[in-house]
Each structure stands twice: as structure tokens, then as C-alpha cells.
UniProtKB/Swiss-Prot annotation:
<keyword id="KW-1133">Transmembrane helix</keyword>
<keyword id="KW-0997">Cell inner membrane</keyword>
<keyword id="KW-0812">Transmembrane</keyword>
<dbReference type="InterPro" id="IPR021147">
    <property type="entry name" value="DUF697"/>
</dbReference>
<dbReference type="Pfam" id="PF05128">
    <property type="entry name" value="DUF697"/>
</dbReference>
<dbReference type="GO" id="GO:0005886">
    <property type="term" value="C:plasma membrane"/>
</dbReference>
<feature type="transmembrane region" description="Helical">
    <location>
        <begin position="100"/>
        <end position="120"/>
    </location>
</feature>
<feature type="transmembrane region" description="Helical">
    <location>
        <begin position="70"/>
        <end position="90"/>
    </location>
</feature>
<dbReference type="InterPro" id="IPR006507">
    <property type="entry name" value="UPF0283"/>
</dbReference>
<comment type="similarity">
    <text>Belongs to the UPF0283 family.</text>
</comment>
<feature type="transmembrane region" description="Helical">
    <location>
        <begin position="213"/>
        <end position="233"/>
    </location>
</feature>
<keyword id="KW-0472">Membrane</keyword>
<protein>
    <recommendedName>
        <fullName>UPF0283 membrane protein YcjF</fullName>
    </recommendedName>
</protein>
<keyword id="KW-1003">Cell membrane</keyword>
């Protein structure tokens, strides 16, 4: 038997035709135009943080100027002249048996040698600080690389610089997790998740401790000058501690350079984050109304110390931040507020007893 016919279906609107793609006319570029050709930008609105970091890199990139080369050449020529004159004086004093002049030449040679040694030491420490930025760039390249052979040696070098012993549990877990079939990206990624957090946790504890000390000191101290000196001293100590944790030995000039890098990084890249994480929370909770003026100033000083520590941590780390593992200012803010409230409650309850 044949199946019955289905009833007719009437549509209210006619069928829509599929849209046809419209192609633009062919355009041919000349050789002169192809040299100045630039592709159109797909995303014209980059993130503020990326723009700020690019501005920081451009501002901190060393610039070789003619005046600097002339000054360095003059200093080198002056140093060579001093050494040559010292050798001539020593030879004349030896020939004439002028022992007093010979002793003066020996003392001058010791002073010059000590000065040269200190300059070489400072230069080596400054070079080590600059080398950390190159290591961070190399790690960023390895994290996007699919090659094999460089990742393990690079991570072992980082562990040696940080003073992590071969018998450390975190390093042993990393050795157990890697194998020959993994590429550099996977090996460096495992190091970033298994070994690097050990140093990051120590740096976070140092930042929390120094920020809490700054907050409490400002909150209870009545002298503004003492507060300023204390905060400056503690911030420098914090930067030194973080640099030591990550295996960087700071000298005088390298310490100044790192402090300058931290301040410039805050000035360029920290304003938006500081307003976003601090200002809105303060307005919502109205902390200024519930805490005293000194307590509010103490929280501000503690947040500044924490911000310095976070940026010093970022500049001293040999690896870039991965998977949003960068410490946030809000975490330290909540901790500082809790510690300050606890201290104020204890101070109020002690006179009642």
C-alpha cells in the first residue's frame, strides 16, 4: 500500500536567498608602495597594562649618547695617565733611593687598586641585575617554544643561582616530572609551577611582614619625620631581601638602579591598578570614617611598601608571570586591615584592664 500524501504547507514569507560574498576589486602595489606597506591593526585598543609596560621598557632601555662615550673615553685616558705617572714616580724613587716617595707610591697603588676592585665589583653586580632581564626574556621565549634541549639546562641554572640545593623536595619533584619527550615549553612550565613558587612564597612572606611593620609604625608613631625615615629604610631593606631571595647580589649602584626601576615601574604601570584595587574598596567600605587618620595613613604606607615589594619581586624574578600567579595588592590590603584592626582593639582593651 502506498503512504498517504502529506498536506501542503504554505509559508507566510518567501524563502530568503543566501547572501553572496562581495569581493573587492584586485589592487596591485608597486615596488615603492610595498616597502612602506603596513598591515592594518586588528585590535586598536590594547590593554592599559600592556601599554604601561611598553612605556616602562622604552624608558628603562639604556641609550648610548655621544656625550657618554666622550666622558667614558676621557675617564679611561685619565686612568691610563695616572697609572703611567705612578709607574714613572716609582721608578724614579727606586733609582734615587727615595724611600719616603716609594712608600707614598705604594700607598697610592694600594688605594688605586682598591678603587679599581670596587668599581669592577659594582660593575659585575650591576651587570648581574641587567642580566636578569635578559634571562626573563629568554624564559618568555622558551615558554612559547616547541624545541628541545635548552629548557632543562636553563632551569638548572636558575635553581643554582637561587641557591636551591639538588636535594630540595621541590627540585626533586621537578626532576621526577620531566622526561626526554617533553619540549622546552613544558619543562620550563613545570619548573614555574613546582620550583619557582618556593621562592615566591618566601618573597610574599617578606612583603607581608615589611608592609605590616610599616602600617603599624605609621599608625602609632606621632612623629612624621621619624615615619618617613623608617619607611625609607624598611623599603630599601625589603628590596635587598627580595633581591637576595632570587639570587641577585646588590651593590651600591645596582641597588640604586633597582630602586629606580621599581619607582619608574610604579609610576608608569601602577597608577591604574592602585586606583582599581584600593580606591574602590576604600570608598565602598568607608574605612576613613571608621578608622582614625593615623590608621588610614598607616594603611596607605603599608600598601606603598607592598606595592614596592611586588614590583621588586617582578623585576628580580627570572621567569615571567604565568596563569595570573602575580600577587595582588588586594590580598595584602585585606591582611593589613585585619592586623591593624586587631592591634587597635588590643590597644583599646588594655587600658580598660
Amino acid at each position: 500500500m502506498s503512504e498517504p500524501l502529506k498536506p501542503r504547507i504554505d509559508f507566510a514569507e518567501p524563502l530568503k536567498e543566501e547572501p553572496t560574498s562581495v569581493f573587492k576589486a584586485q589592487q596591485t602595489f608597486s615596488e615603492a608602495e610595498s616597502r612602506t606597506f603596513a598591515p592594518a591593526a586588528i585590535d586598536e585598543r590594547p590593554e592599559d597594562e600592556g601599554v604601561a609596560e611598553a612605556a616602562v621598557d622604552a624608558a628603562l632601555r639604556p641609550k648610548r649618547s655621544l656625550w657618554r662615550k666622550m666622558v667614558m673615553g676621557g675617564l679611561a685616558l685619565f686612568g691610563a695617565s695616572v697609572v703611567g705617572q705612578g709607574v714613572q714616580w716609582t721608578m724614579n724613587a727606586w733609582q734615587t733611593q727615595d724611600w719616603v716617595a716609594l712608600g707614598g707610591c705604594a700607598a697610592g697603588a694600594l688605594i688605586v687598586g682598591a678603587g679599581v676592585g670596587s668599581v669592577v665589583t659594582e660593575w659585575r653586580r650591576l651587570w648581574r641585575l641587567r642580566q636578569r632581564a635578559h634571562e626573563r626574556d629568554e624564559a618568555r621565549e622558551l615558554l612559547h617554544s616547541h624545541s628541545v634541549g635548552k629548557g632543562r639546562a636553563f632551569c638548572e641554572k636558575l635553581a643554582q643561582q637561587a641557591g636551591i640545593d639538588q636535594s630540595h623536595p621541590a627540585l626533586q619533584r621537578w626532576y621526577a616530572a620531566i622526561h626526554e619527550t617533553q619540549n622546552d615549553r613544558e619543562i620550563v612550565g613545570l619548573y614555574a609551577h613546582l620550583v619557582q613558587p618556593v621562592l615566591d612564597a618566601q618573597a610574599r612572606r617578606e612583603i607581608s611582614r615589611f608592609a605590616a611593620e610599616s602600617t603599624l609604625m605609621i599608625a602609632v608613631s606621632p612623629l612624621a619625620l621619624v615615619d618617613m625615615a623608617f619607611i625609607a629604610w624598611r623599603n630599601l631593606r625589603l628590596i635587598n631581601r627580595i633581591a637576595t631571595l632570587y639570587g641577585i647580589e646588590l651593590g651600591y649602584y645596582s641597588r640604586l638602579r633597582l630602586f629606580r626601576l621599581v619607582l619608574l615601574n610604579i609610576a608608569f604601570a601602577g597608577a591604574s591598578e592602585l586606583v582599581r584595587e584600593v580606591g574602590m574598596d576604600w570608598m565602598s567600605q568607608d574605612l576613613a570614617a571608621r578608622l582614625s587618620t593615623r590608621a588610614a595613613q598607616g594603611i596607605g604606607a603599608g600598601l606603598l611598601t607592598a606595592r614596592l615589594g611586588i614590583k621588586a619581586m617582578e623585576l628580580c624574578r627570572p621567569l615571567p608571570w604565568i596563569d595570573n600567579d602575580k600577587p595582588r595588592l588586594g590580598d595584602f590590603r585585606r591582611q593589613l586591615i585585619g592586623q591593624l584592626k586587631e592591634t587597635l582593639q588590643k590597644s583599646k582593651s588594655s587600658p580598660e584592664k
